[in-house]
Regions:
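Short amphipathic alpha-helical face segments that pack within enzyme cores
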Residues: 82, 119, 173-177
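Short amphipathic alpha-helical interaction elements and helix-loop-helix interfaces
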Residues: 93, 97, 126, 181-184
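C-terminal folded domains that constitute the principal catalytic or ligand-binding module
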Residues: 162-185
């Protein structure tokens, strides 16, 4: 659609102006009509001939991403700053130059119908650039996250003696989309 076309300069300006994400009216309006990375898992698993109506509505309407009053969503938004700071502190112990920067809405001019809003951009001299997507699951709010690893429908799994993001979970699709759209390795 022509209405979604964007130059690189406009994309850079949009990302800068939307770093407050949910507190930015511009963030909401520019998500409308774009398939955002948070929807990639659902898009990849919906029927092409008969797509999920709620998925289509979620992409086409601005109001759908303004939802509040959902305990799991509210919990995640409330805990995100603390989780970000704990992650930053943990990384600084072994990565002296580690930094997290706020991120806005990224739109790649080559694919203007797609968008991504990671929770932050990360960088350090030894590891390079990346991004962070923070998840604070309401479902395990009263337990140790390590106990949930490998549980059915949980997004983390044991793999080769380590804990990894499940490649079949919607969060995997979200993060892969974010990495591509934000042009992070």
């Amino acid at each position: 659609r022509d209405g979604l076309k964007i130059t690189q300069g406009e994309a850079d300006y949009l990302e800068e102006c939307t770093k407050l994400q949910r507190q930015s009216a511009l963030w909401y309006s520019h998500r409308k009509g774009r398939i955002t990375a948070s929807k990639f898992g659902a898009v990849c698993h919906t029927s092409i001939s008969s797509p999920s109506q709620s998925l289509v509505e979620g992409i086409l309407t601005e109001e759908n991403c303004r939802r509040r009053g959902i305990p799991a969503l509210d919990w995640g938004l409330e805990k995100e700053p603390c989780a970000r700071e704990e992650y930053r502190q943990a990384m600084k112990k072994t990565h002296v130059t580690f930094m997290i920067e706020q991120a806005g809405l990224f739109v790649n001019p080559l694919y203007p119908n797609l968008g991504a809003s990671p929770d932050g951009l990360v960088s350090c001299t030894c590891c390079g650039d990346g991004l962070i997507e923070i998840k604070c699951p309401y479902s395990i709010r009263d337990s140790n996250p390590a106990a949930a690893v490998g549980r059915a429908n949980f997004y983390l799994e044991h793999s080769e003696g380590d804990v990894k993001l499940s490649r079949t979970h919607a969060y995997y699709y979200q993060i892969q989309g974010q990495l591509a759209i934000c042009d992070r390795p």
